[in-house]
């Protein structure tokens, strides 16, 4: 009977499908990122990661060899979201400004990973290396001596990572409470900040600091044929 045969065929197809989505590096990376976001970096173990994916730990090792490799996948996922397009089309200062804001925004959403990513080698992380390659090419085109580029990038990254924390600082971080009389200059400066209510303004602080760094870095350059792009 055609109807019976079709029903049997559908049952067989359903029975042959895995009970869970097929595991992949992308699934592992996303699950690891969720785990860190929820419980912190120390919660990221291969056993907990496997449990969150509802698979045996041995299944993970078909895709990743270690926790270090999982971290590289996370690093690549995050760095792949940093906008480096400006280095192809914008003057150097504007490109660095755009890159810096994008970089800070990506990592301000993943604070527990900053201490890890900041110390993680980029070895075998293609998206991370792609990001650094675009930045390096932008610096070269602006006339930067090759031997000074990485130092400049590291200096910028140090500021960017710290500023990512400030995005998450409480609005009243500079409230002096009942000690206004003991800190008249500081209290007045807080009150006169861009926000009339004295709230923490991470964007204003970051823009000010990044502009100062860009100006300062540009000032260290020797005169070069492409310095007009600064």
Give each language-model segment a name.
Residues 1-23, 185, 189-197, 225-230:
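N-terminal intrinsically disordered/low-complexity leader segments
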Residues 27, 31-69, 73:
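Helix-turn-helix
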Residues 28-36, 74, 78, 103, ...:
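Short hydrophobic clusters on alpha-helical segments that form packing/core surfaces
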Residues 84-130, 146, 156:
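Hydrophobic alpha-helical connector segments
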Residues 131-180, 217-221:
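Hydrophobic alpha-helical bundle segments that form small-molecule/ligand-binding pockets
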Residues 167-201:
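A surface-exposed regulatory interaction patch that couples sensing to output
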Residues 203-230:
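C-terminal all-alpha effector/ligand-binding and dimerization domain
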């Amino acid at each position: 009977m055609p109807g019976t045969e079709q029903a049997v065929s559908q049952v067989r197809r359903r029975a042959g499908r895995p009970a869970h989505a097929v595991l992949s590096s992308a699934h592992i990376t996303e699950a690891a990122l969720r785990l860190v976001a929820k419980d912190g970096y120390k919660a990221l173990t291969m056993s907990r990661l496997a449990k969150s994916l509802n698979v045996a730990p041995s299944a993970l090792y078909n895709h990743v060899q270690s926790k270090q490799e999982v971290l590289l996948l996370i690093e690549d996922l995050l760095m792949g979201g940093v906008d480096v397009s400006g280095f192809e089309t914008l003057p150097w200062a504007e490109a660095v400004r755009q890159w810096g804001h994008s970089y800070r925004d990506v990592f301000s959403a993943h604070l527990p990973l900053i201490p890890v990513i900041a110390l993680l080698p980029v070895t075998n992380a293609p998206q991370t290396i792609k990001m650094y390659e675009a930045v390096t090419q932008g610096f070269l085109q602006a006339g930067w001596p090759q031997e000074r580029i990485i130092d400049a990038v590291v200096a910028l990254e140090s500021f960017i990572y710290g500023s990512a924390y400030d995005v998450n600082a409480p609005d009243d971080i500079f409230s002096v409470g009942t000690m206004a009389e003991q800190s008249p200059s500081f209290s007045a400066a807080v009150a006169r900040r861009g926000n009339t209510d004295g709230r923490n303004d991470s964007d204003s602080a970051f823009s000010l600091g990044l502009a100062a760094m860009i100006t300062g870095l540009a000032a260290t350059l020797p005169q070069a044929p492409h310095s007009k792009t600064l």
